[in-house]
């Protein structure tokens, strides 16, 4: 008798969980924006060029906006050009 009650309760529980999960909306794909800026110094002044642009981005934005795919290009006159992508619809 106990086994039947436990089995029945388990079936009800699993059906409720399934019903709840089937009503959730799928997650929307994030939209990425591009950020560019020029800075003093070269891309290799303080190590890895991608890391330099990553930190340049964080200095210009709040910590919750995380950049990705950062790239650095040297410009004439001891300058560097940074470009990063970030999620802009958060």
Curated annotation (Swiss-Prot):
Signal sequence bounds: 1-19
Highest taxon, organism lineage: Eukaryota
GO biological process: defense response to fungus; killing of cells of another organism; signal transduction
Subcellular location: Secreted
InterPro entries: SCRL
GO CC, any one term: extracellular region
Disulfide bonds: 33-88, 43-72, 53-82, 70-84
Keyword line: Antimicrobial, Disulfide bond, Fungicide, Plant defense, Secreted, Signal
Main location: secreted
Family, as annotated: Belongs to the DEFL family.
Name by which UniProt lists this protein: Putative defensin-like protein 243
Lineage per the UniProt record: Eukaryota, Viridiplantae, Streptophyta, Embryophyta, Tracheophyta
């Amino acid at each position: 008798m106990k086994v039947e009650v436990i089995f029945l309760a388990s079936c009800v529980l699993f059906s409720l969980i399934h019903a709840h999960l089937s009503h959730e909306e799928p997650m929307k794909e994030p939209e990425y924006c591009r950020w560019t800026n020029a800075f003093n110094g070269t891309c290799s002044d303080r190590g890895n060029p991608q890391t330099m642009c990553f930190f340049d981005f964080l200095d210009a934005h709040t910590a919750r906006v995380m950049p990705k795919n950062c790239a650095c290009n040297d410009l004439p006159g001891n300058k560097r050009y940074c470009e990063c992508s970030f999620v802009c619809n958060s």
